[in-house]
Amino acid sequence: MTTLPPLPMTRPKLTALARQKLPCSSRKIPRSQLIKEKDDIDHYLEVNFKGLSKEEVAAYRNSYKKNICVDMLRDGYHKSFTELFALMEQWDALREAARVRSLFWLQKPLEEQPDKLDYFYHYLTRAEDAERKKSFEDVYNNLYALACYFNNPEDKWVRNHFYERCFKIAQLIKIDGGKKEAEAHMHMGLLYEEDGQLLEAAEHYEAFHQLTQGRIWKDETGRSLNLLACESLLRTYRLLSDKMLQNKEYKQAIKILIKASEIAKEGSDKKMEGEASYYLGLAHLAAEEYETALTVLDTYCKISTELDDDLSLGRAYEAIAKVLQSQGNTTEAIKYLKKFVKIARNNFQSLDFVRASTMLGDIYNEKGHYNKASQRFQQAFDTTVELMSMPLMDETKVHYGIAKAHQMMLTVNNYIESADLTSLNYLLSWKESRGDIEPDPVTEEFRGSTVETVSQNSEHLEELSRFPGDQKNET
């Protein structure tokens, strides 16, 4: 969006005079004081400026907003006055509604913002002049300048008003091959997208895309309008597909994402094409179409490798691992997750590292490889401690504790199954002290790798008892 410089304008006579008495005071002045001040001003002007007309005297008395309106009417800009007056009424209505909802409403009244009033006067009157001359491109440019000026959070509704005006005027411009119409569709798409009306946004972005196909048009920053159309359309399609997937409308989501993928290929942007493949692959995964999901995600993997984009490659490995895990192919899933862990570690992506380590720990835990599961969960937990993320810390702490309990369960079960006096003594000793428990040296060779010392386990359990969440319970 264009950032406009300060406006070098020649002000009408009344507003030029009125400007000299700014800034306006927001305090309410008693009527008696106003009458006295009016008399004082009249006397002062009569003594010192005998040549002033009544209109010039009125410029000092009236508000800046009123002088702007008077100048518009005096100069014959009746349409500009009507539009400005309607905007001022809406401005006051919105301020009043916001004041009722919040005691901290800081938006100033329009009469206390002379710069905005100047912009209104300058561009609205120029647009009206251009409209009289049937120069619709100049009308568009002046209205668009106002939209750019009011592109801030508190005035976005004003920006949207001028976007809509630009859209109507753009339909009348026939000399530029449809460029202004394409830009107007882009702005209307943004308007609806920000308002959450995705279907309406998609309609405008589709028209924007159609008008820019085969064109070399660029925006004010030098970016291709066709590429912007592709990006906007893909973003909207993805948001629409997310809603469809939430409602389990898998076929519709896949259909719209296939369309997005085709548009991405037209844009000749490999990164954008890869993103489209990624979301399409996830949609196939949600629909349990695993083979198709693997094929599409493999395309994303190849594009990420070609672009030397490690972070995208990590996302591809994660998604492929989820598909393989859903198929029950945990061995291959582990391979891809290890690659994901390596990329996350090398690129200092802590959240990705936590997620990958947790996924690996879950798989190892399900397979009964409790030592490996415990190691992965511990890595995830240690990383969340560094991140100081309490929700993640609590989640990984639970995973870690479960894996350590499973480790201990193997040793305890073996002692119980032995049913001899020595094993019973070990169990009773541990039960009393909750300290170390050692495997029976006689039966250890038969237990193999499944029998472990729990001295390390108990240390970890004590460590878990010192976690932040448990300290509250002790107190």
Swiss-Prot record:
InterPro entries: Bac_ResReg_Asp_Phosphatase, TPR-like_helical_dom_sf, TPR_rpt. Disulfide bonds: none annotated. Keywords: Cell projection, Cilium, Cytoplasm, Cytoskeleton, Flagellum, Repeat, TPR repeat. Pfam families: TPR_12. The keyword Transmembrane helix does not apply. Residues 459-475 have a biased composition (Basic and acidic residues). The keyword Repeat applies. One of its GO terms (biological process) is cilium movement. TPR repeats lie at residues 92-131, 136-173, 182-215, 234-267, 274-307, 314-347, 354-387. Residues 436-475 are annotated as: Disordered. It is found in: Cytoplasm, Cytoskeleton, Flagellum axoneme. GO terms for cellular component: cytoplasm; cytoskeleton; sperm flagellum. The TPR repeats are required for axonemal localization and flagellar beating. Axonemal protein which is implicated in axonemal and/or peri-axonemal structure assembly and regulates flagellum assembly and beating and therefore sperm motility. This is Tetratricopeptide repeat protein 29. It comes from Macaca fascicularis.
